[in-house]
Design a protein with these regions (language model features):
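Catalytic loop of the DD-peptidase/beta-lactamase superfamily, centered on the K-T-G motif
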Residues: 39-91, 221, 226-233, 238, ...
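N-terminal intrinsically disordered, acidic low-complexity segments at the extreme N-terminus
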Residues: 4-5
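Bacterial N-terminal signal peptides
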Residues: 27-37
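Hydrophobic membrane-targeting alpha-helices
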Residues: 37-38, 127
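Active-site-proximal loop and beta-strand segments within enzyme catalytic domains
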Residues: 43-49, 66, 95-210, 217, ...
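Bacterial N-terminal signal peptides that target proteins for export
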Residues: 9-28
Length: 608
């Protein structure tokens, strides 16, 4: 079913807090119940030195990292701070190998995860510079083998540009053999998706796609005559002096969860998340970006390309709000007040997290790599704090204090009570909302919340202890929700800090075809998955909505839910907007029985 439901993978809403605002909101919601009543470490006073003196930055960031590591049981952590062409500080904390007491250093190699997408996009742009690819032409021109079905014949094509900005309409993932011990070659997706559908019209909404990056990787191979890993080695890693960096599958690195070693699984989509590197090497890439594509005597990318990759690409699209995208780089999710645009990309795998973030206008950057499942929130927070402090040290621009504007609570209006009643697809999956009691109560991923209306028309969140008593939680204080109708769709807009984005959508009940109603029940995946897989998959009807529920043995307390909207007698799509939405569930006949097909997986109804 939906991507988070069928693989306990890089997009787990429990921990994936690093890449964009949507996952920051998700992690906040899910972390809140764990932080109620928790004691906090005393805050260290931020010191200010002379202009150009980064020693106070090093001191404060070291304290922040050590605090996060202690509070979240993070095993290994490395960081580098870059000012234009100079690495001003780099350090490792904790252990690369806990059992053998091998310390983490700046040279420690980690799984950099989705930072890979910046490199894959850079390779695509490099081939465009060389006249091999036109990023504004249909992808099929550069990759003739590419083929996928569509329900949007009037929409524009999938292009390399909209793939790089995650607006291609492609599914987020192709699930078959996605996250396993020994994955097949990533380019198997080219043939695999021929019977799949686009999830949305291209250039419609942000929908993060690992699949899209694998298609770009195949495009690089097709138009360069080299294997993807070889192309990256010859055209980026060697010219940049990144001697410890490579694209590899599987990854031979240690990983931990709460200081306990965990088995490392590999995302099949190497161009999307298969980068191995250290902070020393990644600093070289950042320096190249600041030097307009130059490294030493070599021009790796043109100045025009480096500027285009950090230029907002989706400003005019109605569902963008503040979720701005460059090419490969995300231009949202890391906030540095006064610093101008922040370009970043994080990497989030179940066992490790990373962040590479830059202030292009000031040529300041930070790279963070960690080998721990529990570092998801930390890598983003530390990156933002480090950039803010570096900005102050370099320019004298002081971090603007967060403006906390609180308006009085009020009773919800009749219109609000009407709107907030029913099923909503959100960043944390399917949410049931009820306003029958006169308040707006929501249930999501096994937790209970209350939506509180305010005089300014916005809504805030309270967590309901034991599902009964609504209380304010610090993690929710800067989250505000509002509603909007765009292209006929009833949208919930989420705002955290200074950034807004699509948080969810109200679902409209539609008749469920008899073919689907006959198939409600428990399911199993046919064929062994050599990696994490769900032990409970249920298809059910709930209040006129077709609902999928999944649990994983690794996280038995977490119930993941997604709604399906029928589009024909034999096809339904995951409901809502954004990543993992719009993907097709098909009824098929195989070996004389009715089965479900979803994104390369075949599901069979259990007999008992």
């Amino acid at each position: 079913m939906q991507n988070d439901l069928l693989t306990y993978n890089a997009r787990s809403p429990l921990e994936d807090h690093a890449i964009v605002l949507r996952r920051r909101l998700t992690a906040t919601l899910l972390a809140a119940s764990l932080t109620l009543g928790a004691c906090s470490t005393p805050v260290m006073v931020r010191e200010t030195g002379e202009r150009g003196d980064y020693r106070p930055v090093e001191k404060y960031v070291s304290w922040l990292i050590e605090r996060d590591m202690a509070e979240n049981q993070i095993t290994g952590y490395s960081i580098a701070l870059i000012d234009d062409q100079q690495v001003i500080w780099q350090k490792g904390f904790g252990y690369a190998d806990l059992e053998n007491k091998i310390p983490a250093t700046p040279e420690t190699v980690y799984r950099a995860g989705s930072i890979a997408k910046v490199f894959t996009s850079a390779a695509t742009m490099q081939l465009a510079e060389r006249g091999k690819i036109d990023i504004d032409q249909p992808l099929v021109k550069a990759l003739p083998e590419f083929s996928i079905k569509t329900r949007f014949p009037e929409a524009g094509p999938v292009t390399p540009r909209n793939v790089m900005m995650h607006h291609s309409g492609l599914p987020s993932n192709y699930m078959g053999n996605l996250f396993v011990r020994n994955p097949p070659p990533f380019d198997m997706v080219v043939a695999g998706i021929k019977n799949e559908y686009l999830s949305t019209p291209p250039d419609f909404v942000f929908s993060y796609s690992n699949l899209g990056m694998s298609l770009l990787g195949a495009t690089v191979e097709k138009n360069s005559g080299l294997g993807f890993a070889d192309y990256m080695e010859q055209n980026f890693f060697t010219p940049l002096g990144m001697t410890q960096t490579r694209f590899a599958s599987p990854a031979l690195t240690k990983a931990y969860d709460q200081n306990k070693e965990t088995e490392v699984f590999t995302l099949r989509d190497m161009p999307a998340a298969g980068l191995l590197s250290n902070v020393v090497d990644l600093s070289q890439f950042v320096k190249m970006q600041f030097a307009e594509g130059r490294s030493g005597t070599q021009q790796v990318l043109s100045p025009a390309t480096t500027h285009e990759m950090v230029r907002v690409q989706n400003a005019k699209l109605p569902l963008t709000f503040d979720a701005y995208m460059g090419l490969g780089w995300l231009l949202n999710g890391v906030e540095v007040p006064g610093g101008g645009p922040v370009a970043s990309h994080g990497g989030s795998l179940p066992d490790s997290h990373s962040m590479m973030a830059i202030l292009p206008e000031h040529k300041l950057g930070v790279v963070i790599l960690s080998n721990s499942a529990t570092s998801a929130v930390s890598v983003t927070r530390v990156a933002a704090e480090a950039l803010s402090l570096m900005l102050e040290a370099k320019t004298g621009i002081h971090p603007a204090p967060k403006a906390t504007v609180r308006t009085d609570e009020r009773a919800p209006s009749a219109e609000e009570l009407r709107f907030f009643n029913g099923h909503f697809d959100t960043l944390v999956g399917l949410v049931n909302v009820s306003s029958k009691s006169g308040s707006i109560d929501a249930e999501a991923v096994g937790h209970h919340f209350q939506l509180v209306t305010h005089e300014d028309g916005l809504l805030s969140l309270k967590y309901k202890i034991l599902g009964l008593v609504p209380v304010r939680v610090g993690l929710f204080e800067d989250i505000r929700l509002s509603t909007a109708t765009i292209n006929g769709r009833q949208i919930i807009v989420g705002k955290i800090g200074g950034e807004s984005m699509v948080f969810g959508e109200k679902l409209r009940p539609a008749p469920i075809p008899e073919n689907f109603l006959k198939l409600v029940g428990s399911y199993e995946i046919i064929g062994k998955i050599d990696g994490p897989s769900p032990d409970k998959i249920i298809l059910k009807e709930e209040g006129g909505v077709l609902v999928g529920e999944v649990r994983f043995p690794e996280k038995p307390e977490l119930l993941l839910r997604i709604a399906f909207q029928p589009v024909s007698d034999h096809e339904a799509v995951t409901a809502g907007l954004g990543s993992g939405r719009g993907d097709t569930l098909r009824l098929i006949k195989e070996d004389g029985e009715d089965r479900l097909a979803f994104s390369g997986l075949i599901l069979r109804k259990k007999l008992n």
